[in-house]
Each structure stands twice: as structure tokens, then as C-alpha cells.
């Protein structure tokens, strides 16, 4: 088999890239290791209105669980501060599949239960993918491979672009979807508590009036096996009990890369996108907004390369130039703050924030909560 573009991974980044390429007339194949797209869910499901607008997606009631108008910062003292934020909380299992359907309607093909094993190389150039399907091992050739295969990215690693993750490069996360009756359906909340949540924070993202995603993320250097879920249980039973009382109907645990993007997200015949490229905010762990926008850019650059018959690294570098223009400042600022946090006395930081008379105005002008949402 041979295609113009092979996309490995049917998450939002890969699906948007495939959609863009197929829409422009490219022959596209999506390889997805799961039997069902969109499960298990991997995040708090928040997305900014700006991200959807940038990739040309109109909000659809079929996959929007809540429309957000405000962001709230909660401190251990009980103080809360809020700013206006425009965005949505999604039903990821519906949204992710919706994106793949759009790609298929544009002409892309999809193969499920296709486990990518490695990038196929010819004198250092990526020329396809080896994968294991239901009926054995196969090779598929491509003019461009878009690696959207997640945090460990076998394709990126075998292409020599993705280094091994260290423990402090990962934020370990645990999240419940809770059914209850104490949620403000128009506001998400970030709870900052360095004593209970070292190197991280907790969140509450409403999914309507009686459901919410309640989770916690802890930087890997501060974590240990099972700590994220244990911490979440303690928060739900303790300081957050008045806000998140209810019954869990789903639990998810996982990891998010918080080391910042890999040095090169392109090579001869290959582009990296989403978690595979580690295009995740190093401070907040937010990556859904960047996945959509970088996925769209990757698809567009793949089309340009095929039209120009030039899939060299020097041509594909324009992909990195474009997504860095969009996110460079945000990522650099986030990385600097994340690197500075371990050197701070976080108890003093909390005390300082609690004492600031005009903290809401400071949050509004600094854009901190918007950046958490923007991810």
C-alpha cells in the first residue's frame, strides 16, 4: 500500500491533520491502535473558543457538555478569584470520533487496531510505517508520515526525533467524572495547594449542571505510583468536598509530558504533532488547544510539500516555524515559570496571593487563567 500521507494516531491532532490533508485531495490513511476512538478520555476536556475558531470548527451541541464563561482560582485559605474566560467542556469520546468522521468524509481511510511498530527508513528518510494489524505485520508507504501517536511516540523515536522521557518530564494525573449537584455549569476551577499537590494543581471542569471532571496533576519528580489518585481522593473527601460532592462514574489515570516540545518536530518525510511532539504547556499540562492548531498546520504543510514534490526536512521546517510563531512565547514563559517553581517557597506564594487585595484584577490583566484554559 502507498499513500500521500499516513497519520499515526486518531486523537485530535492526528484527525485534524488527516482532515486537512484529505480535504485538499491527498490520499490519506489513519492508523489507530484502539478499537474505539476517543476512549479512554485523557484530559479535563476543556477547550478554548479561540482554538476551535482558529481551525475552522463550529461548536456542535453533539459534543459540547458545557459552555464556559468564567475561570476561578481557588486557594487553600478558601479564597476564590475569578476572571472571564470563553470556552467549552467537551464530550471527548464524541468529539474525537466526530473529527475522524470529518476526515473520512473528506476522503481519508482509517484502520483500527493498527499498532505502529516503527518508522520505515530509507537512508535516514522516513518513507512509511510498519504496523501490526489484526491479520499480522504490514508495511505502508507514504510520501509524508505524520506522527500523532502520543506521549511515547514509537514513530518519533524510531525516526530519531523523540528522546526518552525522564520522570520529571511527566505530570501524573488522576481524574473522576462525578455526578452530583454542586457544580456551576458556567465556570471551571483551578485549585492551587502546594502542600497537598506538590508541583501541580487540582481542577473541576463542569459538564452541565450535575456532572464534572474532577482531577489532579502532580509533577513526576514529586510523584510516586498511585499518589495522584490517592491525592485526588483526599481532596474530594477534604478541602474540595463542598464543591464536588457526588458519585464517581468514571476514573482515568495517565501521564502528560511537561518538558516542552521536542527540539525538532520535522524531518525528512515526517512531521510530529500533539503529545508525540510534546506540544503541551510545560506549566499547566494543557495540550488540546495546541493539538488542534498544530494538527491543522501539519496537514496544511503536508499538502504544500506534496504539491511541491518536496518532502525534505528543509521544506517541512516551515511546519515548526508556523506552530512556533503561534505558541513560542506561551511555551517559553510557561517553561521559565515551571523551572522557577521548585526554587520558591510555595507556602509563601500562597500566602502572598491570599493577601493581594486586587488579585482578581491581576489575574485578569496577566491572563494566567486564560493561559490555563488556552493550554
Swiss-Prot record:
Keywords: FAD, Flavoprotein, Lipid biosynthesis, Lipid metabolism, Oxidoreductase, Phospholipid biosynthesis, Phospholipid metabolism. GO terms for biological process: glycerophospholipid biosynthetic process; membrane lipid biosynthetic process. Its EC number is 1.3.-.-. The keyword Transmembrane helix does not apply. HAMAP family: DGGGPL_reductase. Is involved in the reduction of 2,3-digeranylgeranylglycerophospholipids (unsaturated archaeols) into 2,3-diphytanylglycerophospholipids (saturated archaeols) in the biosynthesis of archaeal membrane lipids. Catalyzes the formation of archaetidic acid (2,3-di-O-phytanyl-sn-glyceryl phosphate) from 2,3-di-O-geranylgeranylglyceryl phosphate (DGGGP) via the hydrogenation of each double bond of the isoprenoid chains. Reduction reaction proceeds via syn addition of hydrogen for double bonds. This is Digeranylgeranylglycerophospholipid reductase 1. It comes from Methanopyrus kandleri (strain AV19 / DSM 6324 / JCM 9639 / NBRC 100938).
